[in-house]
């Protein structure tokens, strides 16, 4: 539930890792 960081930030651009199931949360990409 968004507790595992994906090692990507989403301050300026969306999460590229969203293709792998990650989502932006608090300017950092987390895996759902």
UniProtKB/Swiss-Prot annotation:
InterPro entries: Cyclotide, Cyclotide_bracelet_CS, Cyclotide_sf
Cross-link (Cyclopeptide (Gly-Asp)), chain numbering: 1-32
Domain notes per entry: The presence of a 'disulfide through disulfide knot' structurally defines this protein as a knottin.
Tissue: Expressed in leaves, flowers, peduncles and seeds (at protein level).
Intrachain S-S bonds: 6-22, 10-24, 15-29
GO biological process: defense response
Record SUPFAM superfamilies: Cyclotides (SSF57038)
Function: Probably participates in a plant defense mechanism. Reduces growth of and increases mortality in larvae of D.saccharalis. Kills cultured SF-9 cells of S.frugiperda probably by disrupting plasma membranes. Has hemolytic activity against human erythrocytes. Has no antibacterial activity against E.coli strain ATCC 8739 and S.aureus strain ATCC 25923.
Name of the protein in its database record: Parigidin-br1
Family assignment from sequence similarity: Belongs to the cyclotide family. Bracelet subfamily.
Keywords, ordered alphabetically: Disulfide bond, Knottin, Plant defense
Post-translational modification: This is a cyclic peptide.
PROSITE patterns reported in the protein's UniProt record: CYCLOTIDE, CYCLOTIDE_BRACELET
